[in-house]
Amino acid sequence: KLCKSRNQLLSSYPSSIKEIRFYTNLDKGFRHSSSVLYFAALLYWGIGNFFTRAPRLLSPLQINKEESLINTSNSIGGIEYSDAYLYDNDARFVFNFIDSALENNCKAVNYVESLGSKQDKKGDWLTKLRNNRSNDEFEIRSKIIINACGPYVDQQNQLSNQKTEHHHVFSKGIHLVVPRLNKNERVLTFFADDGRMFFAIPMGGRTMIGTTDTHVSTPETE
């Protein structure tokens, strides 16, 4: 489902969501061979209906030639595969999405909190809202509700007595922003000695290096 959703987003927002290549180097001692990861990448490509460019199996010589930044002295090879990314950033994408909705007679409001929803006998949704500036509460009726609360999706479902099969798991990490490391528009991927994955993501004239691998119970930061 995630791959199909990604493909739909790539087709619907070609100027905002684009395909990008992930370039993965593997060192000696890694728990899997490059061939195993290559077949996993082929499976991922197939699950996505072969919508993106095909994965590649890389030799240390190829990696050294195509990305000389990578130290291949201990390399056993690697893989390259495709996924998607937001060309600008998530904030701009959301703003443009809301702006487009407003042009089609949508009503967008700030500082209004959903206190939960319930269905009436006709199947309509009644949602209780609170104006967090005046503390006034009111109710609206709708045919459909789309829960787009991001990390607070589960919390909103609880308020509305909605049960789902899947739930969010939260994680945090650290990201370092440094001057651009590589000229190619691809994400460099590395595995630490303990198996953690690190990304070096191109962002304009900068590269963002990091990982999010520490599980937390809530989305709020300290």
Predicted feature locations:
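Helix-loop-beta segment of a Rossmann-like dinucleotide-binding subdomain
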Residues: 64-104, 126, 139-140, 212-221
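Internal alpha-helical scaffold of NAD(P)-dependent oxidoreductase catalytic cores
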Residues: 8-10, 92-96, 163
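Dinucleotide-binding Rossmann-like beta1-alpha1 core, especially the glycine-rich loop
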Residues: 1-67
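A conserved short coil-to-beta-strand element within the FAD-binding core of flavoproteins
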Residues: 110-126
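A structured beta-alpha segment of the ubiquitous adenosine-cofactor-binding alpha/beta core
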Residues: 114, 128-139
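Active-site substrate-recognition segment that forms the wall
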Residues: 16-19, 116, 139-143, 147-222
